[in-house]
Amino acid sequence: LAQPASAEDSAQGEALSPPASPKEGKGAYFSDWFNQDLTLIGSKDISFGPKPNDDIYLEYEYFGRKGPFELYGYVDVPKILGIGNDNDKGVWDHGSPLFMEHEPRISIDYLAGRSLAVGPFKEWYVAFDWIYDHGSNSANRANTLYSGLGTDIDTHSRVNLSANFYGRYQWENYGASNEYSWDGYRAQLKYIVPISTFDNGASLTYIGFTNFDFGSDLKNDPARTGNSTVATNVLLYAFTHLRFTLVGRYFHNGGNWQDGSELNFGDGNFRARSDGWGYYAGVGYQF
């Protein structure tokens, strides 16, 4: 069979760091290949909608590779400490109690039993990206499935590079007009660059990923756009267990909202802020 890629061969696992513990003695709920961590994250000016959010939330994250299956995902509990700006609602104040994203890929090479590499494209996958925001009710809920084709790209360098191309099916979308339809596409690029290791056992890694969504029929609606770009840049300083992250994320038409458009959601006019930088800082434990 085609050899499964290790965590170091793919940029799909966005939290690349040293193994959480020695292979022996991880217990019934741990494994050598499945990595997990819990992180408390503070965020500022996050523009997935027309009103930027500030929040402190708890995130459970996992990643790993087993046979043909490459897994990455996370589950967030918004506003876990009850701290956020006026736009922010979470688990304790009738907002969303749960937000999650899961990005499994299945190796076509592995299932075919041979390498299907072409030039720099060294492995191929059936790829998915499922994003779900539970919301407080159906009008405040989002449920999106991206499905398509993915690949790992040989850069002949320390840079790990992966790419995915998806079509999007939209179930709920906070009441938007594109609900329950196939609507647009996503081109996704992920890249990981190990920067350095230190005498204290820590490592410093740059992790980046860019999502370009395009072709949405939302462009036909007032104050909405057919495309959206989110570019994320992460610095991860990680020990065997303890992890520190700093993130700068750039939004353009975040959530398919037109930056600067005048809106009114029932509490007065305001101008959408869907372009610009948002920031995160986190402290976590990998196990």
Residues of each region from the PLM?
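Transmembrane beta-barrel outer-membrane domains
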Residues: 51-55, 93-99, 119-121, 138-144, ...
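Outer-membrane beta-barrel "beta-signal"
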Residues: 273-287
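Short loop/turn motifs that connect adjacent beta-strands in outer-membrane beta-barrel proteins
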Residues: 22-34, 63-73, 108-125, 153-162, ...
